């Protein structure tokens, strides 16, 4: 059947990348189709039941600032919230939400089903319709042809997915779901640069068989933080504890004894696993000097006894899993509900993409999520939103948009993938961002919501809330600038009495806030401030880090000169005199769009960038005189 409706955007896959891609395109007014092999698994948390964490929550806040769904779903489904790095600087603080899988998934599905311009259809995609070098649509498993101006592929671990438990293997996109074989073969036919990656998950445990009394409880923060700029604590369901236990020498001996049947250590799995989320087999091998490793028992939800033992991801045979679980303190009688497993899947070298996440080889075809070599819900959601918005803009022949490294962690993510490529699952960290003081979790809305509004991603309700917040920040900052404390006036005396600090000369309340040991709560009490915690936090960080932030702005201004020098798409690196063969090949492979991007390619020297710049200028002058 040839479906009668022509879509602007078709999104294949209903995971974290696919849902954000479909929602973004539909919010922008494009006729959008979301194809999923199973409507019941939309927004499924395939691995750990958590959103956020170091570097990751910055991405979640950016998705949220652009109108995305992930943060609000985390607030509606979060059963424990914590601020990580709370004693460190503002740049590296991160919110983490332990999520109820069912509630989170329900929140995502509700958002999808109530989104205007979005159709959902349950059917696996088997083929892409490609005419010449342009995608024209999708063919489903049943042979239904859907036509579209653009297509976004968000296939997760489903492309050629193989599940491993010990030396046993089976085809699957994740436990209980079939893989995407026909589509994987079709993509290989298109000569896109394909590789294999691997990820894994731990066995799930029945909480009724665990002795929590010998474990360390890990409560959430109080008052509970929220994930979304539109979130409220009243959205949160009941809050619960996680628990901490540890592996031991017996556990490690059991694991070592099973390595001869491990698919990772016998060469059965060829795909590379995530460096920063290693399996328990990897941990005892790489960190053989350690006597134990932490295990976090995380509830999967309020209406289930299922626990996620974070820290013991494994693909060892089930009999070994059974023994290793029962060797851990408090889990001596543990019942395993689901075995752990590893999954191997196809991914495509992200250097074959443009910075808009469109493939260089096929016009109108976009990739987002694990297909690009990343790991994590947050990384997937960020790519999905960007791919969805750019597919939407291309469909209407509008200029596409990707944030720069100084604008967003999304920009860092995309720039790293396209410029550097990846041979192992890529995870976001704050350390990857050179301008992290400007790219804080708390100011994602200041950085992106105005842009999102211009792009059509941000609705009236979110825009009004953002404008109200920014007006409150401006009003309160102005008020504090005009309140003065002096050694002999009432405000000055109250300040000294409250804080025990010295006050030798007259200064404004803003100047008092600049002091290292003074926080906004104290200034609010001193001056009778009634603004929200969010507004107070914004003011405090802006005041305390003003000098550092200004220096980063100066660095950005210098970089912009390189960013503004575009490299023509048809630029011939072979004619650049003095460029080594190795550097020429690297530049031809990546085809950077600006001199700044060229400078970030490993092995491309400042001298090489200078040679390219000189050649571009010569070419431009030749064109002018011609």
Curated annotation (Swiss-Prot):
SUPFAM superfamilies: FAD/NAD(P)-binding domain. FAD binds at residues 13-18. NAD(+) binds at residues 273-287. InterPro entries: FAD/NAD-bd_sf, GIDA_C_N, MnmG, MnmG-rel, MnmG-rel_CS, MnmG_C, MnmG_C_subdom, MnmG_C_subdom_sf. Its main location: cytoplasm. The keyword Transcription regulation does not apply. Gene3D superfamilies: FAD/NAD(P)-binding domain (3.50.50.60), GidA associated domain, C-terminal subdomain (1.10.150.570), tRNA uridine 5-carboxymethylaminomethyl modification enzyme MnmG/GidA (1.10.10.1800). GO terms for biological process: tRNA methylation; tRNA wobble uridine modification. GO terms for molecular function: flavin adenine dinucleotide binding. It is found in: Cytoplasm. It comes from the Bacteria. GO terms for cellular component: cytosol. Keywords: Cytoplasm, FAD, Flavoprotein, NAD, tRNA processing. It holds the Pfam family GIDA_C_1st. Its cofactor is FAD. NAD-binding protein involved in the addition of a carboxymethylaminomethyl (cmnm) group at the wobble position (U34) of certain tRNAs, forming tRNA-cmnm(5)s(2)U34. Homodimer. Heterotetramer of two MnmE and two MnmG subunits. Belongs to the MnmG family. This is tRNA uridine 5-carboxymethylaminomethyl modification enzyme MnmG. It comes from Acinetobacter baumannii (strain ACICU). The lineage of its organism: Bacteria, Pseudomonadati, Pseudomonadota, Gammaproteobacteria, Moraxellales.
